Structure formats: C-alpha cells, structure tokens
C-alpha cells in the first residue's frame, strides 16, 4: 500500500505553475508509487478525489565526479487534475 512518505515534493516549475491555472498539480514521488496508490493517499491525507492522473517515469541522470560515474535517483512524476475550486492542503495541519 502507498504511503504519504512516498510523496517527495510538489513541483513548482514554470511549466507546473502554468498547469496550476488549469487545475493540474505536479507531484514528484518514489518510483514504486502507482496511480491507484497516489489516489488513495490524496483521498486519505488531503480529502481530495482527483479527476485524472497521468504518470511519467524519470530515470536518474548519469553524472561524473572526480573521474567516477554515478547516477542520481530515479523518480516518478504525476500530473494530477483536481476538481474545480479544490487545492491540495493537508487536512491534518
């Protein structure tokens, strides 16, 4: 089962801020999160039922440091369409 700890952050980029005007929130999560898991977390912790969820898998970039290769962490990005007039504010605040 998915947990709130699997959500890393809500992304605030130029693209995501433009999408917020249309009621879409961009959420970065761990790679094991699923659409149904995210829907459960949003219902349980935020009291919001999303209209639509699109997911995107982002592989970690390969970076070099002092001659050695390493890889940044992979993550999933979700585009969550919320009902009109609803925002993500924690019900446990």
UniProtKB/Swiss-Prot annotation:
GO MF, one annotated term: structural constituent of ribosome
InterPro entries per the UniProt record, alphabetical: Nucleotide-bd_a/b_plait_sf (IPR012677), Ribosomal_uL23-like (IPR013025), Ribosomal_uL23/eL15/eS24_sf (IPR012678)
Gene3D superfamilies: 3.30.70.330
Protein keywords: Ribonucleoprotein, Ribosomal protein, RNA-binding, rRNA-binding
GO biological process assignments: translation
SUPFAM superfamilies recorded: Ribosomal proteins S24e, L23 and L15e (SSF54189)
Family the UniProt entry places it in: Belongs to the universal ribosomal protein uL23 family.
Protein's UniProt name: Large ribosomal subunit protein uL23
Primary gene name: rplW
């Amino acid at each position: 089962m998915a947990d709130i700890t699997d959500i890393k952050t809500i992304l605030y980029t130029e693209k995501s801020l433009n999408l917020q005007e249309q009621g879409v929130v961009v959420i970065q999560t761990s790679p094991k999160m699923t659409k149904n898991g995210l829907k459960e977390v949003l219902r349980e912790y935020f009291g919001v039922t999303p209209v639509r969820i699109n997911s995107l898998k982002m592989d970690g970039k390969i970076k070099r440091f002092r001659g050695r290769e390493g890889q940044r962490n992979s993550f999933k990005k979700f585009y969550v369409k919320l009902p009109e007039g609803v925002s993500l504010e924690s019900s446990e605040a």
